[in-house]
Amino acid sequence: EWYNTLSFCDGFSLSIAKEKQKLPYHLNIIDELHINENANSRILYKLLLYKNIEGKYEILESLIDYIKRNAHSSEFNNIQVKKPCITQEIKRIDLWVRDKDYAIIFENKIYNATDQDAQIARYIDTTIDYNYKPENIFIIYLPPFSSNEPELNSWGKYKKDFEKRYINLSFRNNVLPWLENDVLPLINSND
């Protein structure tokens, strides 16, 4: 009986190996390079900086359109990309998009880093210090999975005030599909 079980396992293992050989080669460069959250933010930053030959921030506009389609609030409809200042790791904010009439704070948690005490609140306060009204500040949280939400203490006094100007865009459910479906078609084959 043991012999039959071992023979079955050997045959099954061989079948799995043959089926794996039929699959296309899979390589995730980001994982292989052991890129951390800062490097991940840098990649997103570079994408958002892209301007087409007409000077439009095509990828940033695409992301804003994606957010407008998927947000639980119409508040995001007030965002109009004009002449954004896009920065990375300024004032400890992972990504920061500031335009004349709005500011967007991106908090990247792709590797499940824990929120610091009052982290989002500090970023909101910093943005207010740059003369943005709270009603014109938006928060985009970027965790690996949509079930990951900011810790309550990260919000400080702002959680309720920002619930309509906050969106959780998980890398798995939102960012990757947006890149595949919305960004990839924008890329010129010469770029």
What label would you give each PLM region?
Residues 1-191:
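Charged, terminal alpha-helix-loop-beta segments
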